[in-house]
Amino acid sequence: MDLTTAEQIESEIQRLLQAKRPVLVAIDGRCAAGKTTLAEELRELCGCGVVHMDHFFLQPHQRTEERLNTPGGNVDRERALQEVLLPLSRGEAVSYRPYDCKLQALKEAVHVAPGAVTVIEGAYACHPSLREYYDLKVFLTVEREEQLRRIRRRNGPEAAIQFRERWIPLEEQYIAACGVSDCCDLRFETHDGK
């Protein structure tokens, strides 16, 4: 991730902080575009809290055919709203149990202290049912070849097949159907390991 990207976003956050607190920032975008990396850079730059949408994937009993056929339906956005966005928007502390995809279970609670800025990062962060709660929405994109290269490096070649055949098509359906890039205030293309 190019540090100037994080610096541009941090500058916009500082502008928003002049008008209101707390400021909630969403970072959405394509798989392997650098959403988590950018969130961590913002944590270092401005000391913000970070919540990962990966912690809100559906539990097995929630994965109905109807739900999974809905754009953005494979994330528990209702729980993300109730347990994270609503409390943070009121300046309250957050406590939620992240879902672990490998264990297929909820883990021990994660606590996020209320702060001036919190970043919610991950695919589906800008779902239409959530986007009104953000003060700043950022979209990251990456070219397909680079995306697949990053996924192979991060998750291994076998997992990359599942990403290519299952997760990327679901994300692309969500991005197109929900107008995710268009709803965002800032858009960045990442490349060459940035």
Over which residues does each language-model region extend?
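Conserved nucleotide-sensing/catalytic segment adjacent to the nucleotide-binding pocket
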Residues: 49, 62-105, 117
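Hydrophobic positions on the alpha1 helix immediately C-terminal to the Walker A/P-loop
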Residues: 38
